[in-house]
Design a protein with these regions (language model features):
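Substrate-binding/access-modulating region of protease and related hydrolase catalytic domains
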Residues: 46, 121-212, 222, 266-284, ...
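Subtilisin-like serine protease catalytic core
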Residues: 42-78, 83-133, 145-148, 209-212, ...
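Peri-catalytic substrate-binding/gating loops that frame the active-site cleft of hydrolases
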Residues: 33, 40, 61-86, 114-127, ...
């Protein structure tokens, strides 16, 4: 499986007072970063002070480790495609600059996550392609080194209607699942439609289309959705600026433009970077926002951070430039436009949801084993990011089991018991179904079953319509 670059202790950080007023870093090229005020990146802060470091991974084309604006910002850099982690394309350095360029140092640009230190994994081959195997190794490396957020600004055409272009990689999903299980948030670009057979393209790329991954689309200075940005009613979660972007470039690339004074910045770079555009450069802004939330509260889970970012977004509408955006969550911008200040306020107001201790458990292979004859607990589902939960129960032939799920407000559930022979929900067919819930009194979904064979059965709880919420699940097995 190959992917392409989607081109189209403590550190100085931000203090959050009870009633914040915007701070303006003194970086001289900040005025060229139109996306910073658009994201309200510094609007929730009125001072620069010390906050805990958050490790952020950039899985990309490498990085200029000696760039002046990244001095002291890179903890580790490694190539997973041979050679050095040096950035031959510029893509990874550009992304790294958006997130973690030094802030308020009187030089260059300002990164949007002042508390971020970088772990850079190079996964781009000399021909510009990426193997998912290299990507998966880089993800696991970053998790091992303590990353809390991983930015992946790469992907390929995804067409779920065409078996030759599904874009799915089991290796990639396993690496992402492992990262989520360790409390890491993965942020990914939803992709550009450059190679799509029709435009706009209606499907987000992988890994943005995986559960628990925050998929990010692009909009321009006029506030409208970028024509190149992939759409998706489920997997576009947020939108952030992605046109006429300004950031860092390796100085080996900018030195070829000798008449330009801003060496090391995209204004001096090759043509495709002078006014860089692409969902690749939208995702890092969300990554930076996530890093800020983790720095303010290291106890947050990845799903709590994604929820805060999603629900604090500014809804996109014709009033703020999105001509075709309908009310509510939509396929063009997801929950809306990134609003970092609003996310910080939501965190301070205690709006993060209760974490689900069973996640990730979105498929049979990572389903959570439930032991003991009786179990009763609460968990959550999210139609857009966590539509299904799987619990594994061991039954003997002839043993009886009763399952009952009570949905919270605004939730509609289906509960299915799958036979031991089914290895993945993606392969689910009627022949594997052992039982299915029937909606009973009080809205409770329930069923009873007597096992016809020994083995590990799978209880799937899924939401059947758009919504987010908590449910209670009760499982009782006979002796």
């Amino acid at each position: 499986m190959k992917r392409l670059l989607l081109i189209g202790g403590g550190v100085l950080a931000l203090a959050v007072p009870a009633a914040a007023q915007a701070v303006t870093p003194n970086d001289p090229l900040l005025p060229k970063q139109w996306y910073a005020p658009q994201d309200k990146a510094f609007d929730a802060f009125n001072a620069l002070t010390f906050l805990p470091v958050v490790r952020v991974a950039v899985i990309d084309s490498g990085v200029d480790v000696n760039h002046p604006d990244l001095k002291g910002q890179i903890l580790a850099a490694r190539s997973f495609v041979g050679g050095s982690p040096a950035d031959d394309y510029g893509h990874g350095t550009f992304v790294a600059g958006e997130i973690a360029a030094a802030v308020d140092d009187g030089h260059g640009i300002a990164g949007l996550a002042p508390a971020a230190n970088l772990l850079v994994g190079k996964v781009v081959r000399p021909d510009g392609t990426v193997s998912t195997r290299a990507e998966a190794r880089a993800i696991r490396w970053a998790v091992k080194l303590g990353a809390r957020v991983i930015n992946i600004s790469l992907g390929g055409l995804r067409d779920p209607q065409d078996p030759f272009f599904t874009g799915y990689s089991k290796i990639e999903q396993q690496a992402v699942d492992d990262a989520v299980a360790q409390g890491v948030l993965v942020v990914a670009a939803v992709g550009n439609n450059k190679y799509a057979p029709v435009k706009p393209w209606k499907y987000a790329s992988y890994p943005a289309a995986l559960p628990h991954v925050v998929g990010v689309g692009s909009y321009g200075k006029d506030g409208d959705v970028s024509t190149f940005s992939n759409q998706d009613p489920v997997f576009v979660d947020l939108s952030a600026p992605g046109e006429d972007m300004f950031s860092l470039l390796p100085r080996t690339l900018t030195s070829k433009n000798t008449t330009c004074d801003e060496q090391g910045y995209s204004s001096c770079g090759p043509k495709e970077y002078r006014h860089a555009a692409g969902t690749s450069f939208s995702a890092p802004q969300v990554t930076a926002a996530a890093a800020t939330l983790f720095s303010l509260d290291p106890t947050l889970t990845s799903d709590q951070v994604s929820w805060l970012l999603d629900r604090s977004a500014t809804p996109a509408s014709p009033d703020n430039g999105c001509a075709d955006c309908p009310d509510g969550r939509n396929a063009l911008t997801g929950w809306g436009k990134l609003n970092i200040a609003a996310a910080v306020r939501a965190l301070r107001a205690g709006q993060a949801p209760t974490p689900d201790r069973f996640e990730p458990n979105d498929d049979i292979v990572i389903g959570r084993a439930i032991r003991g004859r009786r179990a009763h607990f609460r968990a959550t589902v999210d139609f857009w990011d966590d539509a299904a939960d799987v619990y594994r129960i061991k039954l003997r032939r002839g043993q009886r089991v009763a399952v009952a799920a009570r949905p919270g407000a605004n939730l509609a559930l289906t509960v299915v018991l799958w036979k031991p022979a089914l290895g993945s929900l993606a392969a689910a067919e009627d022949k594997f179904r052992a039982g299915r819930s029937a909606n009973g009194a009080g809205g409770v979904d329930r069923f009873k079953y007597r096992a016809k064979e020994n083995g590990w059965y799978s209880v799937e709880v899924s939401t059947t319509r758009p919504g987010f919420g908590t449910y209670s699940l009760r499982i009782r097995r006979s002796r």
